[in-house]
Each structure stands twice: as C-alpha cells, then as structure tokens.
C-alpha cells in the first residue's frame, strides 16, 4: 500500500509542564493501535550544546542582552521544519540526540552529558512522527503538523515547578532561578505563548491550592490538588465529532465550562488525552494511506 503522507503530532510545552504525561499517553495509544512512531525530542534541535550555550549566554550578558533556550537564536527552527516537511512526504529525515546524563552517553563513545550525537538519517519503517519539546508550534514548524497539542500550566505553577526542579536537580539557588525567569520573560512572551493560539488542543493544569507567591512555595501542587482545563478548537470538535457530554460522563468529576472546553480532575489528564486523541490518531493513519 502506497503512502500519501506520514502524520506528524507535536506536543509543545515547557519541561515539567506535563509533557511526559502526554508522551506516556501517546505510548499507550501507539501500543494499542499497533502504530510505529519515531520520537523526536525538542532538545536535539537546540543550536548549542550545554557548554557552548554557557559561553553564548555570557557573551550576550556582556553586551547587555540575554540568550535563552526559548528564543529563535538558540534553536534550529528551520532544520526542525525541514525534518517535519521531509518526513511528512517520505517518512525519512535527519535527526540527532541530546545526551542529558551519563547513562545516556554509554551508547556514544567519546561524548559527554550535554552534548549532541552526530546527525543521522531516520532508519526504519515508521507510521508517524511524534515531537515533544518547546517549539512544536512555532510559525516555521506549525504548518507541517497534523495535530498540535499544547501542555501548559498556569504561569505561577510553571515557575514553582522550575524553581523546585532547578534547586533539587541542578543545585541552583532560588535567587539565581528567579533572575533567570525574569531575564527570559521576553523570549517566553515572544516564542512560547503564541504557540498556544495555534494548538488544536490545550491541556492547562490549574492548582486548587494557593500559588499566589510562587517564589516561596515549599511544595509543587500535586495532580490531586489540580484540575486540568482542556480546550479544543471548534474545527477539531466538528471534524472528529468530539462529544463533550460523552467525555464528561466518561471522566468522573469533570464538567463542561464552555462549548469547546472540559475541565477534568488532575489525575484524569492521561486518560482524558487517550480518550480524546485515539480516534484522531486512527483517522490520521487511515487517511495517510492510498
């Protein structure tokens, strides 16, 4: 059977926003539907490795500026768009890996954590591409995406997550983290938030506890202490005949807040995604074949 195109699904959102929950949900869908997907991490399309980035940040600071991983200057948007375009019509393309830890370097002799592997051609017979990272919905990339999903907590929760992650995993002081948040705010406004107006479906986690001052919060609100607001484009609801009343009945404790929005308990986020997205993925795979 000849392919017409290879579907591309992109999850866009900051690290710690819940994109890992989304990836797990998609892995469940792929397994059940017997779909083979190539997974692309957004980190692999940063322009600089960890060591080069530190040098570039210092160079920008000396000039009175700031460079962050949110910005176009620190990423390979055109290369990512080229991968999506090529894969969409051929099932192939160039990819590489970003090595986060010592464990990940074991397969790559001579490379250290924070470095990239060499570029390589995607090998294997895949049905679709799944992207998870910061920039799946930037204007250069979005035209090639068949299903764009945003995962974004409210901003105070995102800051709490970043502060706790950077303190515990990276050893940064709260003061240093707050300065980084302030310094990259322009890039967040310019490059991150516009993507969520392009998404087909948004998942936004909202804590049900006081997060009014995220810089002194002692704990990250748990899923049990949160609700998830799921907003779907009206075009998506119509195209895939999504029944919000059915979803409300399937997901205990949920309610419809607008004609295109359902609110579910935090622990139900993964299940909600599987119920909503599975028929969309089935349709994308079915219509990709001639």
Please give the residue ranges for each predicted region.
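Phosphate-binding P-loop
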Residues: 1-6
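Conserved nucleotide-sensing/catalytic segment adjacent to the nucleotide-binding pocket
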Residues: 35-41, 45-106
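Short hydrophobic/aromatic beta-strand immediately N-terminal to the Walker A/P-loop
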Residues: 8-12
């Amino acid at each position: 059977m000849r392919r017409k195109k290879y579907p591309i699904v992109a999850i866009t959102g900051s690290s710690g926003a819940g994109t890992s929950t989304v990836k797990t949900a998609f892995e469940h869908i792929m397994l059940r539907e017997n779909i083979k997907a190539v997974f692309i991490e957004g980190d692999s399309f940063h322009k600089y490795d960890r060591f080069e980035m530190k040098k570039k940040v210092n160079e920008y600071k000396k000039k009175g500026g700031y460079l962050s991983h949110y910005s176009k200057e620190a990423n390979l948007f055109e290369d990512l768009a080229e991968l999506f375009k090529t894969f969409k019509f051929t099932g192939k393309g160039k990819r590489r890996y970003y090595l986060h830890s010592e464990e990940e370097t074991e397969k790559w002799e001579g490379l250290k954590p924070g470095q990239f592997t060499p570029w390589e051609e995607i090998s294997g017979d895949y049905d679709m591409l799944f992207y998870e990272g910061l920039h799946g919905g930037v204007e250069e990339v979005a035209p090639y995406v068949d299903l764009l999903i945003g995962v974004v907590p409210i901003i105070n929760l995102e800051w709490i997550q970043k502060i706790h992650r950077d303190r515990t995993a990276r050893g940064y002081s709260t003061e240093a983290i707050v300065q980084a948040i302030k310094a990259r705010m322009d890039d967040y406004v310019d490059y991150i938030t516009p993507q969520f107006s392009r998404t087909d479906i948004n998942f936004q986690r909202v804590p049900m506890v006081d997060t009014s001052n995220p810089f002194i919060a002692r704990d990250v609100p748990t899923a049990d202490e949160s609700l998830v607001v799921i907003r779907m484009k009206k075009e998506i609801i119509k195209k895939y005949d999504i029944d919000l009343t059915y979803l409300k009945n399937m997901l205990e404790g949920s309610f419809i807040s607008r004609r295109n929005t359902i609110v579910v308990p935090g622990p139900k986020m993964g299940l909600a995604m599987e119920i909503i997205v599975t028929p969309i993925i089935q349709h994308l795979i079915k219509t990709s074949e001639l």
